[in-house]
Amino acid sequence: MKTRLIKIVAASLTALLTVSCSSKKEIMKKSYWPNEAHLVISVSMQFETGGQPEGAESPFSGTPLPKGQPDLPAESWYRYGANEGIYRMLDLWKKYDIKVTSHVVGTAAAKYPEVAKAIAAGGHEIAGHGFAWDDQWNKNYADELKFVKDGVETVEKITGERAVGYNCNWLRRSPNTLKVLQELGFLYHIDDLSRDEPFITKVNGKNFVIMPYTLRNNDIVQVAGNHWSPDQFLSQLKHEFDQLYAEGAGKRRMMSISFHDRIGGTPAMVKAMEEFIIYAKQKQGVIFMRKDDIAKMVQNDPNTPIDNAEEKYNN
């Protein structure tokens, strides 16, 4: 009887220790973000107005004008981003003490330096978006390096901020892009859709951070492209948030949202985004972060996944 009692006590202690260790592991799993946050939200604010080429996509693209003929209504649609959109979004971020990442086209900053300076003055990240609104996928190594470098230096001269993050036009990288970015001292890029968390890839044997972008929570895709209303876009954000927040109890999750100056900066879209911010901030463990701050945090974190799916291009 005594022996049996000892065995029962021993088994109970073993079970208790197992539960305790399991609980500790669960706590560790929740410690992926500052203050054990469940979910990080990262907002992109693309500043492209003034950098677009002739015939760039607009609400008037369905009835294009002859080549060489200026499309004045389309040009005015783009100017809205510099005149109204960026400033309206900056007011929103300031109201809720949110810092975002702004991918800035070099020629946009050169044409509207006061807008680029206002973004930097608000404490927002200035990230690279090319010298002009142009393709990179078809450039050779030397031309691509010059294109990226010229864009970074143009914006840096205006804002005083040197980009460490990058976004290609329509995400379309060349096989050399990451090697170009690494040579120029970049920390991360966003032209990837493969995960809902940051990850590492090796470029010439060194860690390079991937901060996945979004098409689902992207105004140019859903509002301009699919003709969603601001209410539909808000509903999408809430559903995405709810799911990622629930998953964030057990693993690292990041929610990406993308706004473009002339689309996300309209009154109804800013109002919808404000409703989302209020909705998200009601939950505990939700933080908004700049992409460069996230990238610095995860770059050498052993919990960050390593994915070398594009290894053949990066070495």
Task: List each model region and its residues.
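Bacterial N-terminal signal peptides that target proteins for export
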Residues: 1-9
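C-terminal motif of bacterial Sec signal peptides marking the signal peptidase cleavage site
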Residues: 17-20
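Catalytic alpha-helical scaffold of carbohydrate-active enzymes acting on polysaccharides/glycoconjugates
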Residues: 26-165, 170-209, 234-253, 257, ...
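A structural motif
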Residues: 203-221
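C-terminal amphipathic alpha-helical segment
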Residues: 216, 222-233
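Acidic/histidine-rich, metal-coordinating catalytic segments
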Residues: 260
